[in-house]
């Protein structure tokens, strides 16, 4: 989308090598590492986040990964501190957690829809930074991915999805 792409044939040629390298990193992590890995997958609707999460779950050894999708808060989560829903899914040492959605989602959405002002938004981002520093200091390797589409490309994708009446669209989530 943004010009940073590989030809499909080139990717397919390197795919086994990339898969093997990723499994080797996971194996080394699992065998006595003092670290854990948190992979954060966020971005705009339709940008391919789900495909990447599926690929990671296919490629990695699922015995030492946990994938968590964050959508609307549950009643239990609403009655607890804001970060609790994320904190309880942190991976133990030697393991990987994949967060599909993250602690960035709600502040960004709330700011975009003007439900919070800039000061509240800045405060929430500062709290997120504090959490990430704490996790990093404790040995968590945080890998963040933001998936983006130009507005025109996203609108075309969503319009194409609306045209497909025979299947349920994954792009109907409300905030």
List each model region and its residues.
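Glycine-rich phosphate-binding loop of ATP-dependent small-molecule kinases
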Residues: 1-175
């Amino acid at each position: 989308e943004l010009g940073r792409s590989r030809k499909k044939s080139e990717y397919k040629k390197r795919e086994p090598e990339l898969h093997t390298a990723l499994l080797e990193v996971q194996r080394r992590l699992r065998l006595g590492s003092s670290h854990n890995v948190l992979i954060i997958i966020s971005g705009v609707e339709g940008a391919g986040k789900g495909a990447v999460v599926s690929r990671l779950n296919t490629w990695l050894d699922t015995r030492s990964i946990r994938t968590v999708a964050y959508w609307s808060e549950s009643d239990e989560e609403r009655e607890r501190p804001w970060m609790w829903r994320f904190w309880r899914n942190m991976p133990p040492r030697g393991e990987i957690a994949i967060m599909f959605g993250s602690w960035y989602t709600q502040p960004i959405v709330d700011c975009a829809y003007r439900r919070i002002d800039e000061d509240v938004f800045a405060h929430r981002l500062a709290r997120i930074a504090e959490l990430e520093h704490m996790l990093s200091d404790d040995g968590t390797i945080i890998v963040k991915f933001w998936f983006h589409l130009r507005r025109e490309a996203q609108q075309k994708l969503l319009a194409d999805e609306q045209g497909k009446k025979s299947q349920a669209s994954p792009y109907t989530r409300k905030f």
